[in-house]
Amino acid sequence: MSQTNTLQMTNNNLKYLIAGTGGVGGSIAGFLALAGKDVTCIARGEHLAAIREYGLRLHSDLKGEQTLKIPAYTAEEYAALASSSADCKADVIFVCVKGYSVDSITELIKRAAHKDTVVI
């Protein structure tokens, strides 16, 4: 691991991208947002519309019920943003889509990642 990468990984200003904001991805996004992290969600259909209109709703025994305003985009929208601005590149990408949908987000990952991005 390079020194630059080590410094980035200890920095609290990491940008997190959650690709697939269903049960698993939504929980990860919610807990990261509650911890004050810079989180962006990738969703589609009704999930995307609900997150944009009402916010991300997190139900947790630990944190109770929370509604969080988190930026949400389609994969295509975010890929276009990331292609046009280095500021939109993610430091950490959580892939939380169903197995049969992984192929559909490879282009997003290519465009949203920089050379030191961690993909989980």
For each feature predicted by the language model, list its residue ranges.
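Conserved N-terminal Rossmann-fold NAD(P) cofactor-binding segment
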Residues: 38-90
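Intrinsic-disorder/low-complexity coil detector
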Residues: 1-2, 70
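Short, structurally constrained coil/turn elements
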Residues: 10-12, 66, 113
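Rossmann-like NAD(P)(H) cofactor-binding subdomain of soluble oxidoreductases
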Residues: 68-120
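NAD(P)+-binding Rossmann beta1-loop-alpha1 motif at the extreme N-terminus of oxidoreductases
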Residues: 2-60
